[in-house]
């Protein structure tokens, strides 16, 4: 399906005069501190909005850790793609190539995610003194388990590295910049006994921000001490992940850069991005007009089929709704019914929402995906695909 959509997208771009750049594969040499490797730059670039990756693809040295450390699939996806969005402000896709992190390995990140330890705790954990590099606060083991977790929650959930390569001459690329994402917990989960009930300690944003900035400063210091990053600019971004029960992802809220010849962070820059669930009391309170658009759409859908499962996830940038993804679970009893309903929904999209919003509607049944509807900003007609 992804391959089919890619072909369809290419066709649309060609028809609208915005064709992707189709160039020959470019063989280059990738230089690191201790070796050189041959690599290829892909010949297709769909848009200047996306980074090219060099081939063969190198998976991150911390591959798989993000799945275990973040609360939901929504957070996992947004943590990676959101960091790439921020990267564009520092490393242009027209100049830089993307590569998954090759400097921080699993052992390093695992140790960073630990708490600080006392000498006794180190011994109990079977760790050496050199391993006592955790970025989360010490548990002094004073007071009840509740008191200890409320006093010193786990703030840092994960560290994500993204590398951005730049051409140094016609046939050579090297590391040009690094993005580091720090995933921070908005809720700290703990247990009073093994396999016991799970308890929560909510972490206010102000507290999260302050602790995140302290952690970022220490991460910047450590990164600058690595030989691989000598003279390389590093940007660190703070991500507030949502609770385990949330059906929308968290968001990055600020970032700062360590210049190539510096070991300290520049001033923090705000990131004005946020996801909202529709319908929901928070979206109703913060974005009443958009909430009304969605509710009118939902009510019109339910005139055709009674469904309480119509939900939307809206992405806001600078307090403006830019993307809305809608899920409609429906039980169909025939293909004609599915086609008719899809056409009806496509019309509702055009009637109910402003034309500056990018909209994606996924219609599903117990059998899986039934139809996809996409409407890009300013387009006169939506793209519709009915799965066979």
Description of each model-found segment:
Residues 27-174:
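N-terminal Sec/ER secretory leader and immediately downstream segment
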Residues 153-188, 305-330:
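Short edge beta-strands and adjacent turn/loop segments
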Residues 19-22:
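Bacterial signal peptide processing site
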Residues 201-228, 336-358:
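Short, non-transmembrane amphipathic alpha-helical segments
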Residues 13-17:
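C-terminal motif of bacterial Sec signal peptides marking the signal peptidase cleavage site
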Residues 277-355:
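Intrinsically disordered, low-complexity segments enriched in Gly and acidic/Ser/Thr residues
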Residues 240-287, 306-307, 315-320, 362-388:
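Polar/charged, Gly/Pro-rich intrinsically disordered segments
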Residues 2-8:
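Sec-dependent signal peptide recognition
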């Amino acid at each position: 399906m992804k391959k089919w959509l890619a072909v369809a997208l290419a066709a649309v771009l060609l028809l609208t005069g915005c064709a992707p750049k189709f160039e020959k594969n470019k063989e280059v040499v990738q230089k690191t501190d201790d070796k050189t490797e041959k690599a290829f730059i892909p010949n297709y670039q769909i848009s200047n909005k996306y980074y090219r990756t060099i081939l063969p693809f190198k998976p991150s040295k911390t591959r798989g850790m993000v799945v275990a450390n973040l609360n939901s699939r929504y957070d996992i996806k947004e943590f990676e793609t959101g960091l790439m969005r921020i990267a564009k402000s520092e490393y242009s896709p027209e100049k830089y190539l993307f590569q998954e992190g090759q400097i921080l390995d699993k052992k390093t990140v695992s140790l960073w995610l630990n708490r600080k330890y006392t000498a006794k705790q180190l011994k109990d954990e079977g760790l050496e003194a050199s391993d006592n590099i955790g970025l989360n606060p010490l548990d002094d083991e004073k007071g009840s388990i509740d008191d200890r977790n409320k006093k010193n929650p786990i703030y840092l959930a994960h560290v994500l590295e993204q590398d951005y390569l730049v051409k140094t001459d016609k046939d050579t690329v090297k590391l040009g910049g690094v993005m580091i994402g720090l995933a921070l917990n908005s809720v700290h989960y703990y247990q009073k006994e093994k396999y016991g009930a799970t308890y929560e300690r909510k972490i206010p944003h102000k507290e999260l921000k302050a602790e995140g900035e302290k952690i970022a400063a220490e991460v910047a210091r450590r990164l600058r001490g690595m030989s691989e990053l000598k003279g390389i600019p590093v940007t660190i971004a703070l991500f507030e992940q949502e609770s385990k029960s949330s059906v929308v992802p968290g968001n990055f809220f600020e970032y700062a850069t360590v210049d190539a010849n510096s070991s300290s962070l520049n001033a923090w820059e705000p990131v004005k991005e946020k996801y909202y669930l529709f319908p929901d009391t928070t979206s109703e309170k913060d974005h009443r007009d958009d909430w009304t658009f969605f509710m009118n759409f939902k009510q019109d859908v339910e005139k055709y089929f009674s469904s309480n499962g119509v939900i939307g996830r809206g992405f806001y940038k600078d307090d403006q709704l830019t993307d809305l993804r809608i899920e409609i679970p429906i039980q169909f009893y025939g293909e004609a019914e599915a086609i008719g309903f899809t056409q009806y929904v496509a019309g509702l999209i055009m009637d109910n929402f402003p034309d500056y919003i990018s909209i994606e509607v996924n219609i599903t049944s117990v059998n899986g995906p039934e139809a996809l509807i996409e409407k890009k900003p300013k387009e006169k007609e939506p793209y519709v695909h009915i799965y066979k």
